């Protein structure tokens, strides 16, 4: 399987612009399967726009090496891709620890035995770009850095000087350089980039990135590197449990401006277990569709709180669905939506607590949670991994630890100690998780949906 990892020396070097532009440029003549290292939901939305193919996340905190390879294989085979292009996260070696590479781009590159292209912010650099390249190559000899892309060069003269330095002093080929251009930058908000689903200008912007790549990057050289990818180790582990719900169920999934943070394989795990996904909009539709369960992902409900609050028929239908004991699983923004209010505006009110946006990040971490109560997705006395990233908080005014399904071993959750409000058959948590972390997710949730029809 032909592939490449596009990584950077750090955050803010232009990885997403360059990676998405490369995906767009190559998609004109080839089938591209995009991937994103780490738990991010937003960058994959740009990949989807560039390629017309759902991007998949690869994460070594969530996945074993065998699961990383399986997830990569799933993506490549399901889309019949010619090339797999993997956008890294932060700097190449950044992970959860200063001394190992769990959660890093380097861990994904090694699990997939993939060639790597290093993106360098070349502002005011010439020979130092060569030094950076040498340092990144020297830290781990198992990382195969096959090329460099120079971003933010001042001029053609600057590019040629820096290219010569990297190729002669670091013995690494330079595939091209991108000059500074503020017109191609992306809008941002408190959780980072704005999802492509919200940006009306995204199609034109992605097209512009593709043109920029065609004009400045040696795509033939890049494809040659991918064509010569070394074999992937033939050791795979399943992403979800082979146990399969025999009964057919229907599961509602909101997907609109407010809610759009979902991992592709979470939805596939539900479909594997005979669930039919019914997409709907809590903003635009009048009520919940006729379903057996509800899965509310994250997003930006705080940005669209007025629209959500005005849709009273939808709020009432979801509250009644919970009161009727049908299973609901909600993550982060979904948790806020199920609270009494968001910033004082009425919401679903399954949980009688107020949620609000704050000016400071409240939780930004990989998480480890211990399950203390059975719930629609997990059984008591298990432990699972996830992540949290939120500027919001929920003002929990109760005093009973049994209100929660999870106790936090790593991360903040709702109270600093607990997460996963559980009422009726409704579970709502700040934790985002991936089916690789809990292989029985699809089976448990669909089984609960069937048993509580």
UniProtKB/Swiss-Prot annotation:
Keywords: ATP-binding, Cobalamin biosynthesis, Glutamine amidotransferase, Ligase, Magnesium, Methanogenesis, Nucleotide-binding. GO terms for biological process: cobalamin biosynthetic process; methanogenesis. It is an enzyme of class 6 (ligase). Residues 250-440 form the GATase cobBQ-type domain. Pathway: Cofactor biosynthesis; adenosylcobalamin biosynthesis; cob(II)yrinate a,c-diamide from sirohydrochlorin (anaerobic route): step 10/10. Its cofactor is Mg(2+). GO terms for molecular function: ATP binding; cobyrinic acid a,c-diamide synthase activity. Its EC number is 6.3.5.11, 6.3.5.12. It comes from the Archaea. The keyword Nucleotide-binding applies. Disulfide bonds: none annotated. Catalyzes the ATP-dependent amidation of the two carboxylate groups at positions a and c of cobyrinate, using either L-glutamine or ammonia as the nitrogen source. Involved in the biosynthesis of the unique nickel-containing tetrapyrrole coenzyme F430, the prosthetic group of methyl-coenzyme M reductase (MCR), which plays a key role in methanogenesis and anaerobic methane oxidation. Catalyzes the ATP-dependent amidation of the two carboxylate groups at positions a and c of Ni-sirohydrochlorin, using L-glutamine or ammonia as the nitrogen source. Comprises of two domains. The C-terminal domain contains the binding site for glutamine and catalyzes the hydrolysis of this substrate to glutamate and ammonia. The N-terminal domain is anticipated to bind ATP, and cobyrinate or Ni-sirohydrochlorin, and catalyzes the ultimate synthesis of the diamide product. The ammonia produced via the glutaminase domain is probably translocated to the adjacent domain via a molecular tunnel, where it reacts with an activated intermediate. This is Cobyrinate a,c-diamide synthase.
